């Protein structure tokens, strides 16, 4: 076959396959059999392999998955992906309607209602009609680049019907039938199954190997247009029509409503129809349709005033409580958990539900053998709502919390002003295991590849009993464990070695000192600079530090007044674990060349690791100026959790937005 003929045939096959994809995955109206589709795809793949000079990034063949990635790159959203306020009942919806009408002086308002797809929010960027990048929502400010995985989703067009530059946003999801099939395959292979379709979709999209995502049969509904060049669209409903014309899959079940009564009727209708859909929904999104009215209403500190998400009530089911088991946390708290006859709740099989503490068991009069009502709090965490007393037979057994720890047999105590029972034995194996899991976690030593499963394996094999034991692990020991090969063992040993270089605040937080969170750990690290200096500090010295109270000061002094802890610190030294603060102190910032010099910065939302007052001091010490509002003169917005109206202002004025992680990286350069 000549090059000219091959090129022509490749173009024909691409057009044909794009048409097939659109008919099947967007219109839900397939025109060819799977076998015919596969034959055309295989022919295209073969021709492109033989003629690589004709390969194109938007070829349908890229949907089978490409090169395995090493890591997902971070992406800062051009405009933040904000969350919505919630409504839980008819009264909340009427309050929303009242606020909207007050905000626009009772002008005529039309709402658009859409199904709230329970999947993974993503953004899609197109340049002159070509798909160039896709990213997860992340924290709303910064997400992860998942372009290669999104290319495997056939409902996402790789080339639009117009050469337009835009950003669309939507929800990637896994159809119920695909979820059932995937879990059946996992069970047959002896693998852990996914809890629900949402987790399955999120887990599939975040695979470093796009070929895995390609096999998972994901789909996507686009629900909004974040921005589009050289085009003004007056309403949200028209923007959805426009997206459909471009080739996107939009949900066909949307409806415009002239009154709040029509909105409520739509909500009730889909609450009934919900089980019959082939995808999960967890509510209804209601928006003011007119874009000009949206801009007039603006946003609050947390969410837009022109939209709200109605959350369906948590599904409640009845099952039998067959027993109560106990778990011991890293701080020694003993928590009771209900063992249940397996029952499906909100799309997943539930076998256990939290009972929180002994007082709750007494308050609800929960007994072993009772029939109980179970729901998922926030559609996530199973909990026992109440007992069905009418079903009692008299054979149910009252439950009494033990007097001794289920893990080590030490006597349990209830500390003053606490409802929880605690094991205060420092050598309790359950506490040690949970403490190890905390030590390696993301905000602590952040050891990649060391999660709960591996820690449990190492603990059960008696390879680790203290934090310091992690630093004596060898590749040979890891190779003795299930699911470890040469590469994974080598990578984990290297990750543990890398963690030795962490700054002091990570080590302090990882130790799990009572009352000391990530923010306090950073405060101590910056103030004392070395572990030795902190160990020698008195309670009075600690209390002089801003935001350190008596309880925390006493806890820190008591922690270090322990021979076992001092021995642990000595072992850290011998293994070469860094115990000094590597961050920048405010006093040292005056002479540092900094990005922040001459910049105007706005801080918004809750900063987890560094408080806003501390962040303000550091920015000012680096020559920056911190203001309380966003304007055209603002250079940067640093956004923590629950950031709201200032993000919208940043978008309006085209101001760069960083999350806390990006901010800390710049500070520590």
UniProtKB/Swiss-Prot annotation:
Q: Which UniProt keywords apply?
A: DNA damage, DNA repair, DNA replication, Ligase, Magnesium, Manganese, Metal-binding, NAD, Zinc
* InterPro entries, A to Z: BRCT_dom, BRCT_dom_sf, DisA/LigA_HHH, DNA_ligase, DNA_ligase_AS, DNA_ligase_CS, DNAligase_adenylation, DNAligase_N
Q: Summarize where NAD(+) binds, as residue positions.
A: 34-38, 83-84, 114, 137, 171, 287, 311
Kindly give the Pfam families that the UniProt entry links to this protein. Answer: BRCT, DNA_ligase_aden, DNA_ligase_OB, DNA_ligase_ZBD, HHH_2, HHH_5, Nlig-Ia
Q: Name one GO cellular component term.
A: cytosol
- Residues of the BRCT domain: 591-669
Residues reported to bind Zn(2+): 405, 408, 423, 428
Active site (catalytic residues): 116
Q: Which GO terms describe its molecular function?
A: DNA binding; DNA ligase (NAD+) activity; metal ion binding
Please list the reactions this protein catalyses: NAD(+) + (deoxyribonucleotide)n-3'-hydroxyl + 5'-phospho-(deoxyribonucleotide)m = (deoxyribonucleotide)n+m + AMP + beta-nicotinamide D-nucleotide
- The enzyme's E.C. designation: 6.5.1.2
**Needed co-factor(s):** Mg(2+); Mn(2+)
The reply on keyword Lyase is: no
Protein origin, superkingdom:
Bacteria
Enumerate the Gene Ontology biological process terms: DNA repair; DNA replication
Q: What class of enzyme is it?
A: ligase
**NCBIfam families registered for this protein in UniProt:** dnlj, PRK07956.1
By its UniProt entry, which HAMAP family does this protein fall under? DNA_ligase_A (MF_01588)
- PANTHER family assigned: CHROMOSOME TRANSMISSION FIDELITY FACTOR 18 (PTHR23389), DNA LIGASE (PTHR23389:SF9)
Physiological role = DNA ligase that catalyzes the formation of phosphodiester linkages between 5'-phosphoryl and 3'-hydroxyl groups in double-stranded DNA using NAD as a coenzyme and as the energy source for the reaction. It is essential for DNA replication and repair of damaged DNA.
Protein family (similarity comment): Belongs to the NAD-dependent DNA ligase family. LigA subfamily.
Task: Kindly provide the name given to this protein in its UniProt entry.
Answer: DNA ligase
The protein's organism comes out as Bacillus cereus (strain ZK / E33L)
